Amino acid sequence: EILIGLVGSEMCIRDRSPCYVMDEKLLRKNLSLIKSVADRAGVEIILAFKSFAMWKSFPIFREYIRYTTASSVYEARLAYEEFGSKAHTYSPAYTDTDFPVIMRCSSHITFNSFSQFRRFYPMVEAFGEKITCGIRINPEYSEVEVELYNPCAPGTRFGVTADLLPETLPEGIEGFHCHCHCESSSYELEHTLQHIEEKFASWFPQIKWLNLGGGHLITRKDYD
């Protein structure tokens, strides 16, 4: 059971324990800050279910955040069926069984490789509803200190490096997706953007969007 209200209230604790308890006031404080950053920066901040998927709180989230990101068929369904908007979906690999559901529940689909894109893009074209597709890029830079968790570590299979991108992107690729942060600061984001621009700027005129992935700890006190 999930109860949303003021932590310590008799309603939440005395009569209905065990339960998950969320402090709505603190939640709204964080969401207000996140929305403020999005508005001032001119970006769209989307909710990652990988870190938070308490669906009972979605009505509150929808007041501040419009979209979510998914990494599986069930997260895509959660976005579409419970959050009320189609997901921005990325997965290292899709299956023939899951992909029709992924398409039904997604507005954006990112592929990890061009082989995955070539395999599934004909299904996107035949789907009948607009889905914008992208490719995950690897900037070969990350400040994640634990090598095990570094998606840009040598030998990684996450994303495509600049030397493997064709000069002209395949028809149907409209965006780039990058994920190389974990509880990161704005300074780490700044450094990442510099590397992305250095390696991938020549393709920018060909794309419509850039997804910078998760791991941005915006609510941390020292986040600039």
Each model region followed by its residue ranges:
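Glycine-rich beta-strand-to-loop/alpha-helix junction loops that act as flexible
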Residues: 180-181, 210-219
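Histidine/acidic-residue-rich catalytic or RNA/ligand-binding cores of hydrolases
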Residues: 220-224
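Glycine-rich phosphate-binding "P-loop"
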Residues: 14-25, 39-45, 85
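Short, compositionally biased "basic patch" segments
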Residues: 9-10, 24-31, 66-68
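Active-site-proximal beta-alpha core segment in soluble small-molecule metabolic enzymes
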Residues: 43-207
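Single conserved hydrophobic/aromatic residue that forms the stacking wall/gate
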Residues: 1-8, 12-13
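Gly/Ser/Thr-rich beta-alpha loop segments that engage phosphate groups in nucleotides
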Residues: 7, 50, 215-217
